[in-house]
């Protein structure tokens, strides 16, 4: 197997805990992960606030350095890349942040955010090339270029702004896009279109995606593999269909049971999905399962050591002693059980993007009628 | 033309209604002109009913919440219409009369309400302040028991009364806000996106709490938000807002099973589920119209796949096309 594009090796990140500060927060604990660029994949990272999912994204982007372990780009440590490698890294790995309002400078027209990467990376030699690149990228995400170019950020909806960020990433033809809660600040009716545009980048341009979210429903819709985090530790990972439909780890069961499904006939169990916490289990050791205090199945062993990864099914692992009959698998091998790691070539499915293309047509009509209203 | 349709618009007639909103108009007067945030809204709330209002941002749903409490601040103004609460028109009350109604008869659990707690006051003091404001003698014996009861009703320990807000988690603070909202047993509780800042497990806890206290009290609830899943699981009836108007009202099962308005249909169709993987991710194409210059005729005609010629000029009226299922769309006019 070739060198992975991005690899995290036994990464731990703690905050605080300086010389005079006794309080130390473990944001992410001993986590390993690989992304192989030759096999475009869509992986979701799911967890509640404080689960470490954004810390992981920032580690993979090189925005923070790990406390222990290392993050590698093409086999080289991200902390001491040569300037050439660094530039290539900034091109290969793109990010889309949560807030489509904050990333734009309100004084510049939309064109600025698209021109900057073209200029910085010398993507176009002529003016025509520049225009073609921008038009192609915008149309891929279902936006008519003439409708947004020359406008200011405040004139566009959150959904449009977020899709322009997707188009901006596409300009650079990256190998990996990390999308950190890209739709959580956007209206529900616009979410599907943004996720559709991200998915098209994966299917049509072979770009891998890491989709970070607290929303299991959209994670289920877009990804192949999922990783569920709880307080800085991996609780469960694997094939998204299996994990969501038949969760193993008690935390994942709680999470799935808490989702209000948009169907009045479906139950909404919340905590009733798993039951009440087991209660006192005695002295808590140095290592323990983070979910113990909320877990109805907790046993004395759960507070004495932290559970390893159990390889429960072909495409999934769970970090819970309930599955101690299953063989264990080292953290560093975790991604080998992913569906994307065991597939040859691109994803085979029949996801259609005609909705995005239809958007191009509808927006012409609405823009013409909107301008007639302005008179 | 528009004025004419508004005045002839049918109102949902409810005799046993706790709250009845009739032809409500709320405009924000800006330098560029009047923004018609709420443009002729009618609905009624039965006793003990849970009613949902959904819509995208800027559809006017939060403006409705604030105008029911008469908390609209300039440049916003209630331009017309009535809000009957237990038979009294709130719009015509004086400021002082309205102040007494708030919390006592109609209470609000706001979006991010947990940030509305005073950070330097103990939880007990925040209750005391509310009681004092409504002329309740806080020195009388038993007041601490009452606060303790309120806290335990929302599933918190009585000791929480002596804590400061920063000692509580987001979900606990939101439950304190629910306890505050029910402290004077109001007949209507307005919950404006009460869980939008919370994680899904905590969201369930908060909504479960709200449902329990609402049922105990026999109060009606208006839940405002854009999470269709939350609506499906919590409300009895649902109203869909679009560009300042209510375009559809139905029982929650009918709304999800058989939406009538094209906007409602697209909204339901765009919902991701955990059952099947959709082979196309489709949102609602186009953008929300500006409320400064709303489109003529039906506000949805610029995005509607079933648009007809007269949709551009004639504003459809909300009417009952099936039992308990109201829709404002020209498609259903012949059906009636």
For the regions a protein language model found, what residue spans apply to each?
Chain A
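A short, proline-enriched helix->beta-strand linker immediately N-terminal to the Walker B motif
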Residues: 171-175
